[in-house]
């Protein structure tokens, strides 16, 4: 008659070795692999915080631009960005130092209006503040000069 050893799974001598290896593997995963994966994901997320990474910055507004979205420099992205939201809900990155982009953003701060009662062109502040964009004093001075020119040309007013 052949003798067979009946092993209970808990009392199996191989189980102890496997459980120690399993515990070592688990400890390795917890202390080495998981922090490394979290660190790599944080670096990947850090690159995505700047919305215009590795994209060509356009110097003019693309056709079909619905609105402009200036984004301030912050801790996660150290540069100022301007996004153009298109009518088809796409986005394009614009160069915030380009003249065409600055002109469109500056128009949000000051307006040149015609006061019908006094028959005079005047520069009016819109009181809009962007954290991402300083108030353009040079643009305001340009509008004042242009208003003076229009007032002289249309109404022969001198200041």
Swiss-Prot record:
Keywords: Disulfide bond. One of its GO terms (biological process) is defense response. One of its GO terms (cellular component) is extracellular region. Disulfide bonds join 50-77, 52-93. The keyword Chaperone does not apply. GO terms for molecular function: chemokine activity. Pfam families: IL8. Belongs to the intercrine alpha (chemokine CxC) family. This is Putative viral CXC chemokine 2. It comes from Human cytomegalovirus (strain Towne).
């Amino acid at each position: 008659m052949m003798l067979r050893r009946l092993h209970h799974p808990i009392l199996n001598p191989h189980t102890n070795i496997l459980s120690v290896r399993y515990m070592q593997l688990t400890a390795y995963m917890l202390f080495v692999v998981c922090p490394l994966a979290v660190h790599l994901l944080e670096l990947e997320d850090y690159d995505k915080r700047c919305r215009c990474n590795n994209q060509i910055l356009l110097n003019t507004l693309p056709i079909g631009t619905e609105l402009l979205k200036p984004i301030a420099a912050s801790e996660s992205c150290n540069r100022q960005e301007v996004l153009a939201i298109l009518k088809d809900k796409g986005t394009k990155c614009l160069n915030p130092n380009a003249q065409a982009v600055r002109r469109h953003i500056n128009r949000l701060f000051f307006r040149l209006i015609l006061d019908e009662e006094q028959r005079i062109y005047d520069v009016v502040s819109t009181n809009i503040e962007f954290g991402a964009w300083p108030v353009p004093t040079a643009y305001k001075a340009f509008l004042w000069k242009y208003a003076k020119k229009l007032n002289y040309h249309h109404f022969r007013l001198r200041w």
